[in-house]
């Protein structure tokens, strides 16, 4: 599954400065690479990670140029606990922010979109022993990111 593949991906990293992780169904905007770099610089944090749950396909056009939600950013705020005790994020994102001038410190991390310096992959690697714990992936990695800088 994706968690095992993600845990192995860091083994093929060369000397890349930035790493990005996206879901397979992700669409990219024009100049996405420069936009991501510019937003990351606004974090003013060497260990900053840009991450968010992308808009679902039905509302994706609302967030593009000319869309009614162009200045909105979905924001993951709440964590719920599943019957098995695993923490999981409510989907779709349960909050939003409007007219940001720079990224906000988040309450979580999304495996659907993540952009950071590649040292993240070394200091907070995927736990390849949690390959069957899909809901646990995001929260456990977020907690380890938080405690490691």
Describe the residue ranges of each PLM region:
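Catalytic cores of eukaryotic secretory-pathway lumenal/extracellular enzymes that build
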Residues: 1-149
């Amino acid at each position: 599954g994706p968690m095992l593949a993600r845990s192995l991906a860091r083994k093929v990293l060369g000397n890349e400065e930035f790493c990005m992780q996206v879901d397979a169904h992700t669409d990219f905007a024009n100049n996405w690479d420069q936009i991501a770099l510019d937003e990351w610089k606004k974090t003013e944090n060497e260990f900053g990670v840009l991450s968010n749950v992308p808009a679902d396909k039905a509302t994706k056009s609302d967030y593009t140029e000319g869309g009614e939600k162009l200045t909105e950013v979905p924001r993951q705020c709440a964590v719920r606990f599943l019957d098995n005790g695993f923490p999981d994020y409510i989907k779709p994102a349960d909050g939003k922010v409007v007219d940001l001038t720079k990224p906000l410190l988040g309450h979580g991390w999304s495996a659907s979109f993540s952009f950071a310096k590649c040292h993240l992959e070394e200091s907070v690697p995927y736990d390849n022993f949690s390959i069957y714990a899909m809901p646990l992936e995001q929260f456990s990695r977020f907690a380890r990111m938080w405690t490691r800088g």
